């Protein structure tokens, strides 16, 4: 898996780092990349790194989250609240402010986000006196090797783990077992199909998440309702 990094102005400045970099330097090298920190992403990783940074002596000025509600486990969110770290939901990072010679970060601009996570003009807020922006906005699958494998071997190349989707270790193990049966089929080796179905069911069940019901869903405007819609059929019962 590779980090997902949202696009914002000056996102390539020294001082803008992903949680993986921040944690590695802090936990393995015992080094802080900054004393005053802004965390982007109110999920488990954002909560955990903010908590660890505070324990290491840093000052996390805030955690900003573009969605209207917090992510992650409530126990993790409550832990950073007890440390006095504010969690600002409905805000997106607009800009990292560089120092005079563009060698570090000295501030950031955040703004309220609309339902497409775009900044709303006129709602900008300035956050000053920070040296580090800690990006904790999740991961995306790293499927480059899988793509190359399929180009060479076709459908006889099977993906597992984070090459397929981001999930927990249990899901990766189950997908690995499922792929093993698929390899046996490619080799024309007999196996118990009931075992394959059982593993497949476990794997699919491990992907299921409760359906989130939106109190105020984003609906199309009347003008959009009067225009044609593209209808896509779902071929599979899972994604």
Question: How should these model regions be labeled?
Answer:
Residues 1-239:
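Residues forming the flavin
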